[in-house]
């Protein structure tokens, strides 16, 4: 099958490589970012514990770094 594709379009390997490179780059840009530390849970609904979260970055980058201050309500 690969030989037929190559015969039909001698540039198919270049096209396939370009497509793979594009998909890899796209996935790096739009994939979900995963933190390097553990997750954080805030509050406890059953116990009625709530928190006010301030200083959280809401920038356009998913990796915006911020300093957070936590205070109980």
Swiss-Prot record:
InterPro entries: Serralysin-like_metalloprot_C (IPR011049). It comes from the Bacteria. This is Uncharacterized protein HI_1176. It comes from Haemophilus influenzae (strain ATCC 51907 / DSM 11121 / KW20 / Rd).
């Amino acid at each position: 099958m690969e030989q037929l594709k190559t015969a039909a379009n001698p540039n198919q390997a270049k096209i396939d490589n370009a497509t793979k490179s594009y998909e890899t780059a796209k996935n790096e840009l739009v994939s979900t970012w995963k933190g390097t530390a553990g997750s954080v849970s805030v509050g406890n609904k059953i116990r009625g514990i709530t928190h006010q979260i301030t200083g959280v970055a809401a920038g356009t980058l998913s990796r915006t770094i911020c300093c957070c201050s936590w205070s109980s309500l």
